Amino acid sequence: MGTVSSGPTMEDMFRHMKQLKPYLEKNKDVILALQAGFIGAWGEWHSSKHNIESSDANKRIILEKICRMTPQDRVVQVRVPDYKNLLPKDSEAYRKTSFHDDFIVVDPHRWDGNMHEGTPNFDQIVEEGAFMPVDGELPWGTWSMNKENGDANGWIIDGKKTARQLFLEHYTSLSVIHNYKERGAPDKYSMMYWKETPISEEYLKEKHMPVSDGYFRKHDGSAAQRNAFEYVRDHLGYRLELQELQIDTLKHTDNHILNLSLTLINRGFSTLFNEHPVYFVLVDEHNQVKEFLTNADTNSFQPYRPGDKTYTP
C-alpha cells in the first residue's frame, strides 16, 4: 500500500494481469466489478515510481489490458471519466468500463476530478451509469474534517446533496470506510452527521428522487422520521417494490393452466447487474415446491427510463 522504494514496470503489470486472469474467471460468480488499479500509489493512477501515468498512451494500454483480464461479462471501474475517454468509443473496452468516484464531496473542489454537477464528467456518469455498476467513496474524514477551509466544524459533506448525486449517477454501492467510523477515532465524521440530518418526503418528491408510499410510515400507520444516512442505505442499488400480482386459472381438459403476471417498481438508485434468473415458486398445502423459470431480464429493471428528466418510475 502507498509508495515503495521501487515500483512495477508496465511489463511487471502485464505479467501480473496474466496471472490474475484465470483466477478472476474462475471466481466471477462473486465479482460485481473490478476496479482499475496497478498504477501508482494505492493503485490510484498517480505517483508511480516510473511516472507511467504521465503518458496517455500508457494509461490506455494498461486499461485495455485490464479490460481483457476481466471476465467478459463483468465491468471495470475507473476513478474518473477522463481515463475511460482514452479508449475508442466503439471498442469493447469502452463499453465495459464504468466508474468509481473515490472523492465524493458534492460541491466543487480542486481534487474532485471535475466530477461535480454541471461538468461534462458528471453528465457522462449520469448517462452511462444507468447501464453498469457505479461505486464510490468519500475522502477520509480525518482529512476532510481538518478545518482546511477555516470552518470551526471542519468540512462536513452534505448528506442530502450526496443522496441526490448518488441517485442521479445511479450508484450501486458506496464505501463506508471513509468519513463514517474511522480507525476507532472519537471524532464524528460526515456520515455520522447524516444520521442527524432529517430528510422528508416533500424534499424527495421535489427533487424527483425515489420513495415508496409507506417509507415515511410505521407499521401502525403513524409518521416515521427518516434521515439522510437511512435513505442512502435503503436506496443504493435496487429496491424492488411489488405493485400487483394477477393470477388467472384456466381449465383445459383435466388440467388447470395458471397464468401469473407480476408488476414491480424499482425504487432504488440503479438496476440489477450480472446474472439473476427469476422464478415463480409455488408451495402447496403439503409443502411441496414447484419452480417456474421466467424470461424476466433483471438488467432491465431500471428505476426510470434512462434519459427521462422527470424520473418517472
What does each of the following model-derived ranges do?
Residues 1, 12-13, 74:
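Aromatic-lined substrate-binding rim segments of carbohydrate-active enzymes
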Residues 1-9, 35-42:
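Substrate-binding cleft and catalytic face of glycoside hydrolase catalytic domains
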Residues 6-33, 57-69:
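An active-site-proximal structural segment forming one wall of the substrate-binding cleft
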Residues 33-40, 44, 48-203:
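Catalytic-core regions of glycoside hydrolase
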Residues 227-241:
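Proline/serine/threonine-rich low-complexity linkers at boundaries of modular beta-sandwich domains
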Residues 264-271:
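Short amphipathic, basic-aromatic surface patches that mediate peripheral association
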Residues 271-279:
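Short coil-to-beta strand junction motifs in C2/discoidin
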Residues 291-313:
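A beta-strand/beta-hairpin structural motif
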